[in-house]
Amino acid sequence: TIVVGDSVRPLILHEKKVVDAEPENVGDGFPLSPLACVFILIGITCFVGWLQFKTRKIIWIWDLLLFGVQGLAGCVITFLVFFSTHPTVGSNWLILLLNPIPLIYLPVMVYRAIKGKKDYYHTINIVCLTSFMMIMPFIQQKFNVTVLPLALCLLICSANHVLLYYRQNNK
């Protein structure tokens, strides 16, 4: 309504609904929340790490899956950062965590894991992931609550590699 002096008039002359839409009943979705899924992923990563430490062998299939998914998600984030015209996508700090480097390096990582050779990628990854988790609170971008446990999962996997190589070389 518009009030001018003593007169009151409506802002619009008349109201007409084009479509009378009712919200659809979506039904049951996925039974687990994203946070529950990422904690299950951390549990599986810890179990695989314990298994690797117990058997003294790298389970490279787990690396293939975990770092492959990280690299594929990184391809999507990288595409959005470089080719999207939306102003908020250009400064997406998730590119520090999810980038295509693991996908590109994956064949070398798997080869070195199968041969039992030391891989400096995991040491560098530990530094990058720890740095990301430390600067996360100071970045102006708001992250989903599942980003930190996901980074922790990747950190656990890389730390397990470094610890296992250290254990094998210092028998």
Where are the language model's segments positioned?
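Soluble extramembrane regions of membrane proteins in the secretory/endomembrane system
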Residues: 1-24
